[in-house]
Amino acid sequence: MSFENFAIITLKENVFALLPEAYAPFDPIVDDLPIIPVLFLLLAFVWQSAVKFR
């Protein structure tokens, strides 16, 4: 299987990963959304250090 065939199959299988055309401008933002839970975890440490880990 060549790389081109693999890429085509992968795109067809990931059709649900594509945003509808109306939401296309938000595509770069959607790519970064999975980092939000990590930011909340870091915020918890910043908060606890601010209150001296009570």
Curated annotation (Swiss-Prot):
SS bond list: none
GO BP annotation list: photosynthesis
Location of this chain's protein in the cell: Plastid, Chloroplast thylakoid membrane
Topological category with respect to the lipid bilayer: Single-pass membrane protein
Primary residence: plastid
Source taxon at top rank: Eukaryota
Propeptide, chain numbering: 1-17
Keyword field contains Transmembrane: yes
Keyword Chloroplast: yes
Record keywords, A-Z: Chloroplast, Membrane, Photosynthesis, Photosystem II, Plastid, Reaction center, Thylakoid, Transmembrane, Transmembrane helix
One Gene Ontology term, aspect cellular component: chloroplast thylakoid membrane
Any matching Pfam family: PsbK
Transmembrane regions listed in the UniProt entry: 33-53
Function noted in UniProt: One of the components of the core complex of photosystem II (PSII). PSII is a light-driven water:plastoquinone oxidoreductase that uses light energy to abstract electrons from H(2)O, generating O(2) and a proton gradient subsequently used for ATP formation. It consists of a core antenna complex that captures photons, and an electron transfer chain that converts photonic excitation into a charge separation.
Protein family: Belongs to the PsbK family.
HAMAP family the UniProt entry points to: PSII_PsbK
Summary of subunit composition and partner proteins: PSII is composed of 1 copy each of membrane proteins PsbA, PsbB, PsbC, PsbD, PsbE, PsbF, PsbH, PsbI, PsbJ, PsbK, PsbL, PsbM, PsbT, PsbY, PsbZ, Psb30/Ycf12, at least 3 peripheral proteins of the oxygen-evolving complex and a large number of cofactors. It forms dimeric complexes.
Annotated protein name in UniProt: Photosystem II reaction center protein K
